[in-house]
């Protein structure tokens, strides 16, 4: 079975412009005597891209199939995953909440600023343990359900 056939059985939300290009790196290739290429997944079009939008295409399709109207995730204060989940939710008209670790060095800049600007509900908790973040995010899902929302938790 080809990978395309295996993936075709899962619902997918179109969030990326793919395939992304490969750029030949002539100087590095010359230095090592090998052909080096750089995969430009930063060009997927979703909030500075990367590999995470590819995963989110499947996660969000599952959420939509279940009727979700709210996405919930967690991560560090400068989480790329939180930024991309927020961007995807907003692109699709869904509400979004992110549970992020609060540390003494965080500032409202970079990914955290972007998440705020995109209108995510942001909850900061003091922890260095990812499982604390996930537990808080799952509790937030229960809270949102009690408010009549249909949240879907997206793991990191």
Specify the residue positions occupied by each region the protein language model found.
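PLP-dependent amino-acid enzyme catalytic core
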Residues: 1-156
